Amino acid sequence: KAVIKVTAYSGKPWVNITYRIINTSDDELKIKSLVFYIKKSEDSVITEQLKPLKIAAGNDSTGCGDIRTDNSHNDGPVFMTRGTTELDMIEKKADVNNIRTVVATSNYKTSFIIGKNGEEVNEVIDDKYLVKEANEHFAEVFYGTFMADYTDGEDGFSVTVHQAQQNYPKAVKSCSEGVAVMLVPENVWEITMQSGMAKEQQFMIHFHSPAMKLWEIDNRSLIYQMPDRPYIAPEVFKRAGVMIDVFPVKYNDDFEISLMAKADGHSRCYGMLNWGDTVDQGYTVQGRGGGKPVWSNNEYDYPHACALMYARTGVRRFMDYLIVSAKHWMDIDVCHYSSNPLRIGGQWEHTAGHCKNGVMVCSHEWVEGLLDYYHFTGDKRGYDTAIGIGENVLKLLETPMYQVPGEANARETGWALRTLTALYVETNDNKWLVKCDWIIDNFKKWEEEYGDWLSPYTDNTAIRVGFMISIAVGSVMRYYRIFPREDIRQMILRAVDDLTENCYMDNGLFYYKELP
């Protein structure tokens, strides 16, 4: 299944194209190629074959785009230049009346490959390309641009692929008949989508006059890659009360530096199906992926943490972290098709291959980051995906695993409570509360039977898992804020007192679990 969306803007000479493919089969889907053609005329013929170009630009070892180019003695048919200094000179040599072709990519300064007389030019991004480029940017905000342009004596258009480097493999080419945009170029890298997986990609078509300068075309392409982001001061968020109160009266510099370092230090994994997610090395070395890398699937709602950081600091990159990770989540980490109704709309637990051989449990499904994404962007897919996850949680709570208090650890129903409470706040639909009341009642019974929120561990032990108890406390706290009751308040206090008494170490840290 595929969905194409065209977004046009009043009075603007560009359109945005999004293409989303969904594997609605029970088998893996190997994508041989995925190419869009923008032709100069209806009769034009463009192939996806890429002509080898013998151009040695040199590696940008400094990461600053300092390598200079000299085309003063080059008469074509192909010119390579970095930055905008030589563009005026080359534009005179490559007359648009005889068809000028261009492909361009950037790290700092943009590198242009320009053809005259309709000469084919192309650029390919693959893993080898990326490891040879010194890029120091926060790539969620900006890595570089990737575009192709066709201009003749009558018209011109450029096509920019959004975050192409991050979502490799990608290729573009410009020739005498128009432009080819290769979202999956053939024979460059294997792309295999698992059953139920989706992927959305986007590009911009910018129509322009033959007189428009290349630096202006480049400028619009760069803006597409790094658009302005709105900014609201943290005190406005605090006064509005639309988020939990994470806005201290006085900020502690060491604490703020630590939070920013954690956000900025998250690992980034490139690739069309990987961008926005990360490999969890701890799970991987434990063997949870059977020897293969285990993808975290945004555990535990990393996008929500980014949204809170953006709201409390106003720092733009945290919003971009939210957008990139949420888009991956909506496509890759959620099941869009399955013959098993218990999987439809649900979120996969961390696993190898993103979802391959994955399972779904309440402790690994969350929605707050998706709702944040919806609020910040207006993209209703965030809202719809959150609703789908909530529906899946309701189905899972009916399964035998969750019917006896204490047989699952505290985070299982704790995360379910947090998800359902967030959806009630968002929708004001009472259907989300039915299981909330049931979970609260189970926590009470659990405490009465075991004395505290103990979790089954080995066959002969039940232990405190401080981390999981804290998740349950945080979830019950969110419910209590909406429906304050003294019995719930006292249950929260008893759980925290138990953690402090039994899980708090002399060095000021809480241990993860009691055994081993």
Sequence positions of predicted segments:
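Conserved, compact domain cores that house catalytic/ligand-binding motifs in diverse enzymes
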Residues: 15, 254-316, 320-329
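Long, well-ordered core segments of solenoidal/helical folds
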Residues: 231, 258-275, 321-337, 380-401, ...
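Terminal, non-catalytic domain-edge segments
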Residues: 213-238, 246, 250, 254, ...
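Beta-strand/loop-rich accessory regions of lumenal/periplasmic or secreted enzymes
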Residues: 1-230, 235, 274-278, 297, ...
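Well-ordered alpha-helical segments within folded domains of soluble proteins
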Residues: 293-311, 359-374, 407-424, 461-480, ...
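Low-complexity, Ser/Thr/Pro/Gly-enriched N-terminal "stalk/linker" regions
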Residues: 213, 219-290, 334-342
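Structural helix-adjacent loops and short alpha-helical linkers that scaffold large soluble proteins
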Residues: 212, 249-252, 310-323, 373-387, ...
